[in-house]
Amino acid sequence: MLGVVPPFELTAENGEAFQSSQLAGQVWVADFFFTTCNGPCPRMSVQMRQLQESTRNISDVRLVSFTIDPATDTPAVLAAYARRYKADRERWRFLTGPPQDLRRLSYDTFHLAEVGGALEHSSRFALVDRKGRIRAYYDTSSTNAIPQIVEDILKLRKELL
């Protein structure tokens, strides 16, 4: 275990409140991105879509993309971005919220922030188990990242609650 995700309430791409409790009992993959990113974010979003497809028959898997640029990434902007990447709204959510809440999640909880810039972030994904425990990180620049995540998701699903 690499950490525990604390309770949070943010705003989803549909403008509705999204609580971490909605992920209880689910295995989920998290990433941090921003919609105007010209670096790794588009590739990461393609990989999240690949995960969505690879896990489409696994009912208790969710994907969560947290913006690091809430000033730009409003729910409407996130909704358009989600459509661009063909996100299944039931399984892949895009979240925004107060900058301090997103910063706390990125830096303190997931440790997926890079030091040195306002909009810098890691290109790693985090795997979270059904109890909200961070179980693994994945380097998305690796060609084996998606198959490894799917394999680990299947292992986590076999664990007792």
Regions flagged by a language model, labelled:
Residues R43-L105:
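Structural microenvironment flanking redox-active thiols in thiol-disulfide oxidoreductases
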Residues V5-P6, W28, S122-R124:
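Short loop/turn microsegments at loop-to-beta-strand junctions
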